[in-house]
Curated annotation (Swiss-Prot):
Cofactor(s) essential for the protein: Fe(2+)
Quaternary data: Homodimer.
Superkingdom field: Eukaryota
Name of the protein described by the UniProt record: Acyl-[acyl-carrier-protein] desaturase 6, chloroplastic
Length: 419
């Protein structure tokens, strides 16, 4: 998973479902729930301001209770049984996406290896790698660090999946298809941080001590998953993350490669990682498709909830030990560099909507499920409109970029346009 992978886009975070226009009473949607509101004119002089605030608090509390009840429903025996019944299907359709160890690439396949090149050949290859790396601009280097730091936080992601009900690896060596998938996926993901770390070390362009501290901080910070333990939401989240990571690494490969800045070694590394992520995306996308077939109403509501809140980036607590707004800087730099953009976010949503055939869902949907389906299908266009408006506001405001030092690259300055 890459840092730019789900920058979750502040624009997307502001989006909410449309009010229900079929009701005779005014309504609004909170957390995907319709709540009938009493217009301020009806309160008028009869109710004091404090009473209005108290009523609003009661409404919010009711919404939270309803949401909590819905989240608990995803952990009911009936819902978890859906995952248990999928075990033979996972064995047949998901586990084959893992490659045998002997057929899998390793970091030493992509970078200079003294065991293959010998001492002199290794040093010559490292010198060539450093020469090529010298042409990569600092803006892309910062984005690369963010991606690498996120990949290195794999322990956080594996522990999160192991907490998911009905699929977690409870003993650490369970023989279930779900548990074997999690361990196999983690083993393949482990190479991503390793190969990026090794490239960065050999290139000489990075202050590796500062980069390593960033990794340390991120793993130590952990990641709160919302909602916790729900397999429906966990697989939607991971499918999106894997797709976004593939896009981010693929974009980076193109930007630094022969048609970009001429660093063939880095392009090869990023392209290889991107191919892995696409394979992993296929697995999680298949799982969500299967859930939507087995339980369309709960499945589409889980998709809507995750997208409505914005797919939270796993590295939002990323830190350099100095700037409180580092995450915002990384998001903006990724947009500027083109490694991961709002347009990419929209394209990913559209891709998953097509893959999961969300628009075709009808049978078995409740009213809430239909609203969730419509929200998901309309979301990309909403984000694009908000992006256009945000751009117009930025042009009018005539904001200027600021120059900030980044300790990952020896405090060299990069120019960033913050929101």
């Amino acid at each position: 998973m890459a840092a730019t992978a789900t920058m979750a886009m502040p624009l997307a975070n502001r989006l909410r479902c449309k009010p229900n226009t079929n009701s005779s009473s005014p309504s609004r949607t909170l957390f995907g729930r319709r709540v009938t509101m009493i217009s301020s004119s009806r309160w008028g002089s009869a109710v004091s301001g404090s009473a209005i605030m108290s009523a609003a608090a009661d409404v919010a509390a009711a919404v939270r209770r309803e949401e909590d009840e819905e989240m608990r429903s995803y952990l009911s025996p009936e819902k978890l049984e859906v995952l248990t019944q999928m075990e033979p299907w996972v064995e047949e359709h998901v586990l084959p996406l893992l490659k045998p160890v002997e057929a899998a690439w390793q970091p030493s396949d992509l970078l200079p290896d003294p065991a293959v090149l010998g001492g002199e050949g290794f040093h010559a290859a490292c010198a060539e790698l450093r020469e090529r790396a010298a042409g990569v601009p600092d803006l892309l280097l910062v984005c690369l660090v963010a991606n690498m730091v996120t990949e290195e936080a794999l322990p956080t992601y594996q522990s999160s999946l192991n907490r998911v009900r009905a699929v977690g690896d409870l003993t650490g060596a369970d023989a279930t298809a779900w548990a074997r998938w999690i361990r196999g996926w983690s083993a393949e993901e482990n190479r991503h941080g390793d190969v990026l770390n090794r490239y960065m070390y050999l290139s000489g362009r990075f202050d590796m001590a500062e980069v390593e501290r960033a990794v340390h901080r991120l793993i130590r910070s952990g990641m709160a998953v919302d909602p916790p333990c729900s397999p429906y939401h966990a697989f939607v989240y991971t499918a999106f993350q894997e797709r976004a990571t593939a896009v981010a690494h693929g974009n980076t490969a193109r930007l630094v490669g022969a048609r970009g800045h001429g660093d063939a070694a880095l392009a090869r590394v990023c392209g290889t990682v991107a191919a892995d992520e696409k394979r992993h995306e296929a697995a999680y996308t298949r799982i969500v498709s299967r859930l939507l077939e087995a339980d369309p109403d709960a499945g589409v509501r889980a998709v809507a909830r995750m997208l409505r809140r914005g797919v939270a980036m796993p590295t939002s607590p990323i830190s350099d030990g100095r700037r409180d707004d580092l995450y915002a800087c990384v998001v903006s730099l990724a947009e500027q560099a083109g490694t991961y953009t709002v347009s990419d976010y929209c394209s990913i949503v559209e891709h998953l909507v097509r893959e999961w055939r969300v628009e075709e869902l009808a049978a078995g949907l409740s009213g809430e499920g239909r609203r969730a389906r419509d929200y998901v299908c309309e979301l990309p266009q909403k984000i694009r409109r908000m992006k256009e408006k945000a751009h117009e506001r930025a042009v009018k405001a005539q904001k200027k970029p600021i120059s900030i030092p980044i300790n990952w690259i020896f405090d060299r300055h990069v120019s960033v346009m913050l929101p």
